[in-house]
Amino acid sequence: MSPQTETKASVGFKAGVKEYKLTYYTPEYQTKDTDILAAFRVTPQPGVPPEEAGAAVAAESSTGTWTTVWTDGLTSLDRYKGRCYRIERVVGEKDQYIAYVAYPLDLFEEGSVTNMFTSIVGNVFGFKALRALRLEDLRIPPAYVKTFQGPPHGIQVERDKLNKYGRPLLGCTIKPKLGLSAKNYGRAVYECLRGGLDFTKDDENVNSQPFMRWRDRFLFCAEAIYKAQTETGEIKGHYLNATAGTCEEMIKRAVFARELGVPIVMHDYLTGGFTANTSLAHYCRDNGLLLHIHRAMHAVIDRQKNHGIHFRVLAKALRMSGGDHIHSGTVVGKLEGERDITLGFVDLLRDDFVEQDRSRGIYFTQDWVSLPGVLPVASGGIHVWHMPALTEIFGDDSVLQFGGGTLGHPWGNAPGAVANRLALEACVQARNEGRDLAQEGNEIIREACKWSPELAAACQVWKEIVFNFAAVDVLDK
């Protein structure tokens, strides 16, 4: 036996594989105020006990690996390891469990959503011992929240910038989303803003294509904004999509938007990435730009109930990374979104403090301390008949965004904007008078039609358009 071998043997290191639950399943653990807490929906492979599955998640998303390593002795695993501290069976689902995991704060870089997600939703999602794994919720402790800038400005600052209070903001995505020249695109922006909308928007896949380069679009949209502001006396905006192939190009586009004096830019935060998004959010705060966030790609991640990441987690991550608006679904439109679930993460976007409420899918109490709030954006398959429900569901601190529901008006873009603005003001007035929007919504819209031929025409076009499909992602019974 060589001297080296004798030395290793004398250390007493015992190589091999041991069950994760021996180290990482700790039901006696008392969580700390500084821990990041996670709720995972775990579906183990046949024959894998839930305790072992939960412990494997804790291990593989923190300090563990598939075998014992001698370098474990060079650090304090008890200080740094994740711990599965509770497991609940999911009622009504076969072989599904909610595993609660606590992570010490020292595992994560300050102010980095990228680093947090790399650990918590990293390689563990491909672990063979699990048939499926979904991150349902995270509790971000105040100590970690305070390391983030968050939204560039927040809800109150945005209202002050726009000088608009007491109602939801009104927007429109320019359609067709691809193919228009920059000049025709700017014309549509002008017509919608002149008709009464607060914002118009680039679609998420409008970047800088051969038919419309970004600089041309920015120039024509800025001209449209200033012309509409002059004619209406209201502050207007267009979400100029700064998303690009590199962070440097993205910031270059944001700089040009600032030089034009426009109020807001836009980013696709999931396809663009959290590092790029946080960089843009910091630039926007430093330079007085509002930041609209689109969630393109989210349904690839969040739609399936047993695997992926729930949107409430992606919403929390966005509030930390930074954005003043984010698309949140509509409940009543063409996109996925159950009412209770949607209102749960809408509160997580807007409110300073949100209590645990499993009836809305909120697994943990969340204290955002002083982090500014984010306006939810209801967009996707909505029209004037939806206005009472949208106003009742989302309240004043929201953006209601009608793309086809504006540009599909039979008389053109400006009349479509007029119809939406009048429908919104009728609903806000009725609500302020004490009327029940949920029960009297259709009647309120019909009454308003008497004063607006534009609204009457819109109501006639979309009177039979509904999207009656059951939601895929629903609350557990």
Swiss-Prot record:
Mg(2+) binds at K201, D203, E204. Residues 1-2 form a propeptide. The record marks K334 as: Transition state stabilizer. It is found in: Plastid, Chloroplast. The active site is at K175 (proton acceptor), H294 (proton acceptor). GO terms for molecular function: magnesium ion binding; monooxygenase activity; ribulose-bisphosphate carboxylase activity. The modification N-acetylproline is found at P3. Gene3D superfamilies: Ribulose bisphosphate carboxylase, large subunit, C-terminal domain, RuBisCO large subunit, N-terminal domain. The modification N6,N6,N6-trimethyllysine is found at K14. Binds 1 Mg(2+) ion per subunit. Keywords: Acetylation, Calvin cycle, Carbon dioxide fixation, Chloroplast, Disulfide bond, Lyase, Magnesium, Metal-binding, Methylation, Monooxygenase, Oxidoreductase, Photorespiration, Photosynthesis, Plastid. Substrate binds at N123, T173, K177, R295, H327, S379. The modification N6-carboxylysine is found at K201. One of its GO terms (cellular component) is chloroplast. It is an enzyme of class 4 (lyase). Its EC number is 4.1.1.39. It catalyses: 2 (2R)-3-phosphoglycerate + 2 H(+) = D-ribulose 1,5-bisphosphate + CO2 + H2O; D-ribulose 1,5-bisphosphate + O2 = 2-phosphoglycolate + (2R)-3-phosphoglycerate + 2 H(+). The disulfide bond which can form in the large chain dimeric partners within the hexadecamer appears to be associated with oxidative stress and protein turnover. GO terms for biological process: photorespiration; reductive pentose-phosphate cycle. It comes from the Eukaryota. NCBIfam families: PRK04208.1. Belongs to the RuBisCO large chain family. Type I subfamily. The basic functional RuBisCO is composed of a large chain homodimer in a 'head-to-tail' conformation. In form I RuBisCO this homodimer is arranged in a barrel-like tetramer with the small subunits forming a tetrameric 'cap' on each end of the 'barrel'. Heterohexadecamer of 8 large chains and 8 small chains; disulfide-linked. The disulfide link is formed within the large subunit homodimers. This is Ribulose bisphosphate carboxylase large chain. It comes from Nicotiana acuminata. The gene is rbcL.
